[in-house]
Amino acid sequence: KFYKTNICDREAIYKIFEDEKPNIVVNFAAESHVDRSIENPEVFLKTNILGTQVLMDACRKYGIDRYHQVSTDEVYGDLPLERPDLLFTEGTPIHTSSPYSASKASADLLVLAYHRTYGLPVTISRCSNNYGPYHFPEKLIPLMIANALNEKPLPVYGKGENVRDWLYVEDHCKAIDLIIHKGTVGEVYNV
């Protein structure tokens, strides 16, 4: 079933847990557009941090076998362009660069705190940019395609030197499924 509700609506989330009795919870809910987070950080903080807390509290109250937090490589910040040999690892320190990345890093830390404090069985995955069917038109790939088809200018961010990694959405889902079923509780996985 699909429930369209606000992740911050504790009553609605608890009702879903009561009705469905899930044993695995995967938190895909997020505000995720960096530029919008700069214009209006409040909605990012509410959804990404407080919404995560509501889910974690529901998991504690109703009991689950596994909670999985879908995060982002944005929590690591930027790699220097002059060092293409560097990569993010699960041990890379958090170094946020926008309200979006700060909200996701905060949610990750909250999830790990619930694991340590309450013993909640959690895993976290941090991925790069996803692409695939039904991609929001504000995101880079659909925006570039739409602009090219409509003979509009293609946006260039900064000096045009930024590098982005891309992950097909179905590959991301397969990785999440693998982490949920084979991953170690309390660990973070880069995808």
Describe every region a protein language model picked out.
Residues 59, 115, 148, 179-180:
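Hydrophobic pocket-lining residues that define ligand/cofactor binding sites across diverse proteins
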Residues 1-130, 170:
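N-terminal Rossmann-like NAD(P)+-binding domain of SDR-like oxidoreductases, especially those catalyzing
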